[in-house]
């Protein structure tokens, strides 16, 4: 893989990892357009550049992450369902990675977002701060996150939908989704790297580093823009986008 390809994939990863649009789907589609095969080495590269996106959340929310034990209690509780299921079902989950499943889940997720927003009602009793999330609700948001182990679902999409259904306002649901990515993606990425370390070679380090840095920069940008967007608008545009992307997937990838 060349530097240009690693930059493009880093941009795609950074922009889509924390948006409810499935970064996996975008990476598969863009890789296809670039003529890159979905080899084990290529998948290992995608896993590695996710670390750059994780670092973006740590950088932006470093104050909350380093000064709030109550926040970490909620994150750990929310991580439990995904952590257990991810460890037990690792091989099954990896076997689900197919363009067809990604396409279907993109479309289904888009329809769910539109439906949730249709019934969503803003009220004075909504949870508007992460530290006000009851522990049992944090756990159930983690259950929703577990659904995202199906490729194309979108981890952020599943957790945001879970948050909205459990009474969080849009901004709080989005921020909790970002923060929950830290333990979740750190564990998943670390496990994947341990499983696929033999695919990382010295000659690939420049491309890996380039993709990592690019993903970090664009993830910072995406998170800031996304929080500004959901503070004023709803998630319907993302639902529509997912449906369109799902059909594009069916045309170009299958």
Swiss-Prot record:
Membrane topology: Multi-pass membrane protein
Keyword Disulfide bond: no
Presence of the UniProt keyword Cell wall biogenesis/degradation in the record: yes
Molecular function as annotated in GO: undecaprenyl-diphosphatase activity
Organism domain of life: Bacteria
Compartments where found: Cell inner membrane
UniProt keyword terms in alphabetical order: Antibiotic resistance, Cell inner membrane, Cell membrane, Cell shape, Cell wall biogenesis/degradation, Hydrolase, Membrane, Peptidoglycan synthesis, Transmembrane, Transmembrane helix
Catalysed transformations (reactions): di-trans,octa-cis-undecaprenyl diphosphate + H2O = di-trans,octa-cis-undecaprenyl phosphate + phosphate + H(+)
GO terms under biological process: cell wall organization; peptidoglycan biosynthetic process; regulation of cell shape; response to antibiotic
GO cellular component entries: plasma membrane
Pfam families: BacA (PF02673)
UniProt-listed InterPro entries: UppP
Ranges annotated as spanning the membrane: 1-21, 41-61, 75-95, 96-116, 130-150, 174-194, 210-230, 234-254
Cystine bridges: none
E.C. designation(s): 3.6.1.27
EC class: hydrolase
Family note: Belongs to the UppP family.
Job of this protein: Catalyzes the dephosphorylation of undecaprenyl diphosphate (UPP). Confers resistance to bacitracin.
Miscellaneous remark of the record: Bacitracin is thought to be involved in the inhibition of peptidoglycan synthesis by sequestering undecaprenyl diphosphate, thereby reducing the pool of lipid carrier available.
Protein name: Undecaprenyl-diphosphatase
Lineage, broadest ranks: Bacteria, Pseudomonadati, Aquificota, Aquificia, Aquificales
């Amino acid at each position: 893989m060349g530097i240009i390809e690693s930059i493009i994939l880093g941009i795609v990863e950074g922009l889509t990892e924390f948006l409810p649009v499935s970064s996996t789907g975008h990476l598969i589609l863009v890789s296809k357009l670039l003529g890159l095969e979905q080899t084990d080495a290529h998948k290992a590269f995608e896993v590695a550049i996710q670390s750059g996106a994780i670092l973006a959340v740590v950088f932006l929310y470093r104050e909350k992450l380093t000064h709030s034990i109550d926040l970490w209690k909620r994150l750990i509780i929310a991580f439990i369902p995904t952590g257990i299921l991810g460890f037990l079902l690792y091989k099954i989950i990896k076997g689900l990675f197919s363009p067809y499943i990604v396409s279907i889940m993109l479309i289904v997720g888009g329809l769910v977002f539109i439906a949730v927003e249709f019934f969503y009602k803003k009220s004075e009793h909504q949870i508007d701060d992460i530290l006000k999330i009851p522990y049992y609700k944090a756990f159930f948001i983690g259950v929703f996150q577990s659904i995202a182990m199906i490729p194309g679902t979108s981890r952020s999409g599943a957790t945001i939908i879970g948050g909205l259904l459990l009474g969080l306002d849009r901004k709080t649901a989005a921020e909790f989704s970002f923060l929950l990515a830290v333990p979740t993606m750190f564990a998943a990425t670390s496990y994947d790297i341990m499983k696929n370390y033999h695919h990382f070679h010295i000659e690939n380090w420049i491309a890996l580093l380039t993709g990592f840095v690019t993903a970090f920069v664009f993830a910072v940008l995406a998170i800031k823009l996304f929080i500004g967007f959901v503070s004023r608008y709803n998630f319907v545009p993302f639902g529509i986008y997912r449906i369109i992307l799902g059909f594009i997937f069916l045309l170009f990838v299958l």
